[in-house]
């Protein structure tokens, strides 16, 4: 009933379990992922969690820059007027613990994810051109206990804008922003109509889920796209993220019928 996911991962051989929650803030351009790491072996664990970023800023891998930012203790990807700030915190404090910046798909360069295979990133401070990055968090998990981290990616038009979002996240707290987003989407899907009260619960759940999925295909400016589908780029070199007047009108009409006029 909300656009906050829950994903559970288990590795029996390592004796670890992860619970992840993903959300995009409903007000600000920030993506969050929380990760809880549980020990299932009854002993102290030293765990490294890595996030890899293959960003082609403004849809081109040419002329990108990425650098470690001492002010925020995060990593910044940018080109022209498009900026992404990658950051997080674990139980020990704010900021990333490790990072790697480097070339991707240039000669023999496969990408910085290779640097994570030994559990230690090289901390190169800056890279330019066709680049990618990896950030890492060091976690100490007690026996039969858990460790926590939250990761975020903020988007903006200037460095000041993304750094300001980072400050806002620290002031408000990531979990508070995620909880607020979860509550907002629950309210969006909570449509109180007599005809909905009479249908089976599984059908009503499908209705709410469908309403939320439809909302993910609509821009805050009002554009209703046909399908936010990217996999056809590999086959046809195109997406289906077009705003068709007919399709948009049908969706807007359906939203009007359930009282979501602000979106339609």
Q: Which residues does each PLM region occupy?
A:
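Well-ordered alpha-helical segments within folded domains of soluble proteins
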Residues: 209, 242-257, 261-264
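Extended polysaccharide-engagement surfaces of secreted carbohydrate-active enzymes
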Residues: 1
């Amino acid at each position: 009933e909300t656009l906050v996911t829950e994903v559970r991962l288990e590795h029996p051989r390592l004796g670890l379990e992860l619970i992840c929650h993903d959300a995009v803030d409903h007000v600000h351009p920030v993506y969050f992922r929380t990760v809880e790491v549980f020990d299932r072996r009854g002993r102290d664990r030293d765990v490294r969690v890595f996030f890899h970023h293959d960003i082609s800023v403004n849809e081109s891998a040419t002329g990108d820059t990425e650098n470690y930012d001492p002010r925020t203790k995060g990593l910044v990807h940018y080109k022209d007027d498009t900026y992404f700030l990658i950051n997080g915190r674990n139980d020990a404090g704010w900021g990333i613990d490790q990072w790697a910046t480097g070339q991707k798909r240039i000669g023999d360069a496969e990408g910085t994810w290779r640097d994570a295979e030994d559990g230690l990133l090289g901390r190169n401070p800056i890279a330019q051109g066709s680049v990618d990055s990896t950030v890492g968090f060091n976690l100490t998990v007690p026996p039969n206990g858990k460790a926590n981290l939250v990761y975020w990616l903020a988007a903006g038009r200037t460095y000041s804008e993304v750094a300001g979002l980072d400050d806002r996240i620290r002031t408000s707290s990531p979990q508070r922003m995620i909880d607020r987003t979860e509550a907002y989407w629950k309210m969006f899907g909570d449509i109180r109509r007599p005809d909905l009260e009479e249908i089976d619960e599984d059908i009503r759940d499908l209705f709410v889920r469908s309403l939320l999925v439809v909302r993910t295909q609509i821009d805050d400016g009002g554009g209703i796209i046909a399908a936010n589908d990217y996999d056809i780029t590999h086959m046809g070199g195109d997406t289906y993220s077009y705003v068709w007047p007919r399709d948009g009108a049908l969706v807007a009409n359906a939203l009007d019928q359930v009282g979501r006029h602000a979106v339609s």
